[in-house]
A protein has these predicted regions:
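Short boundary/linker motifs that mark transitions into or out of structured domains
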Residues: 1-20
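Long, charge-rich, low-complexity alpha-helical segments
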Residues: 22-180
Length: 180
């Protein structure tokens, strides 16, 4: 079993680790804080003796888990998350190439994109052009992403699981996560 942390770390005041997720702030004890922190930048295997703690984090929405392993596990963990830019990124990365293109989609699209949607854009070779970005580009972007076949709940996620662009996009997202 693998897991990936969700949410943002809130600055410590009294030594307690706090995590913000979906408008709520969670205070974590030492065990759960260590588990959350270890999977903050990359998926991690769930330690057998700590599975109970990971389950509690998942119930709170602070981690997502999967029984899969390898590239499919990374995809499933990321597809269960909405990808949002951090307000103030401390990391540095090149805006050139694939990483920069994906970053521009994440930063400037008129809606929050999922890993599946980003894979679809990569598969199509769609660049983040002004007519597809921002509030004004939201409708056109949605039409680019979805067809009558993929608009059904879970259809795009299932289709993108088998995309040749999947592993490359997942690698870019993990690099951006480290850079942020």
């Amino acid at each position: 079993m693998m897991y990936l942390s969700k949410g943002l770390s809130v600055p410590e005041k009294d030594g307690t680790v706090r995590v913000s997720h979906c408008g709520r702030i969670f205070a974590l004890g030492p065990e759960m804080a260590a588990l959350w922190e270890s999977a903050r930048l990359a998926p991690q295997p769930v330690p057998l003796q700590k599975a109970r703690f990971v389950e509690r984090l998942e119930q709170s929405g602070l981690v997502v888990t999967t029984q899969e392993e390898g590239g499919l596990a990374f995809y499933r963990l990321l597809s269960g998350s909405i990808i949002c830019p951090q307000a103030e990124s401390e990391g540095q990365f090149s805006e050139a190439g694939g990483d920069g293109r994906i970053w521009r989609w994440i930063q400037y699209a008129g809606l929050r994109l999922t890993a599946s949607e980003l894979i679809r854009l990569e598969e199509q070779g769609t660049d983040p052009t002004p007519n597809l970005l921002g509030e004004e580009g939201r409708q056109l972007l949605t039409e680019k992403l979805y067809s009558a076949r993929t608009i059904l709940e879970g259809a795009l996620e299932h289709e993108m699981e088998h995309s040749p662009a999947r592993d490359g996009l997942v690698a870019v997202l993990l690099r951006l996560l480290h850079a942020g």
